[in-house]
Design a protein with these regions (language model features):
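Helix-adjacent hinge/juxtasegments
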Residues: 67-108
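Glycine-rich, acidic and aromatic/proline-enriched surface loops and short helix-turn segments
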Residues: 109-116
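Short, contiguous pre-domain boundary segments
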Residues: 1-6
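Short, contiguous alpha-helical
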Residues: 7, 11-25, 30-81, 122-191
């Protein structure tokens, strides 16, 4: 496998996960996009905002390509207090989705322009680990996005029962009801 085909494969996997994350917002109210669904406040719009922040950082700033748009929560360091993980009342979902799409475009330019072995520096990592490569950061971003796409699938399912992308391909409502009953019986055997 050549470096360029590996880069193309990583880019494809990244885009599939990006698309999956945004698909979890479809058809939801502003409230449902924003409301915390777990004890750690996981929410769909916050996942999108976080991923936009991470892409601008890892696939932009760390390779000498600063974000073309301001990220106030990075500039004022409130990101360190979780400000990238939720949407303020005055931040529109359209703004956050567009911020994520802008991060994609910026990252896609990095992917097109940089070799996987291009040097990179992550200033917020411990000094002994700061020097790395673009390829390492691209793999990290693919993993980060896939990780949060899974969170988005589960969060969406908690909101309205809509599962991941292949949920309906696996079975209809009755199939899922029977499946959940089987899984519950197996768990109940260990009460």
């Amino acid at each position: 496998m050549t470096s360029s085909s590996l880069s193309a494969d990583l880019h494809r996997y990244l885009q599939e996960s990006r698309d999956g994350v945004l698909s979890r917002l479809e058809g939801l109210s502003q409230y449902d996009m924003r409301r915390p669904m777990t004890p750690s406040a996981t929410n769909l719009l916050g996942l999108v905002k976080h991923l936009a922040t991470m892409e601008h950082g890892y696939l932009g700033d760390c390779v000498g390509r600063p974000a073309p748009v301001p990220l106030p929560w990075v500039e004022d360091e409130s990101v360190l207090d979780g400000a990238d993980m939720w949407a303020k009342a005055d931040e529109s979902s359209d703004e956050i989705v567009e911020l994520y799409r802008a991060a994609w475009r910026h990252s896609d330019e990095s992917i097109a322009q940089l070799a996987l072995d291009a040097p990179a520096e992550v200033k917020w990592w411990p000094e002994e680990r700061r020097a790395t490569t673009f390829g390492h950061l691209l793999v990290r971003m693919v993993a980060e996005t896939a990780h949060h796409a899974g969170h988005a699938d589960i969060t969406r399912e908690m909101i309205d029962g809509r599962g991941g992308g292949d949920h309906d391909d696996i079975g209809g409502a009755e199939w899922w009801e029977r499946y959940v009953e089987r899984v519950q019986r197996a768990a109940d055997a260990h009460r």
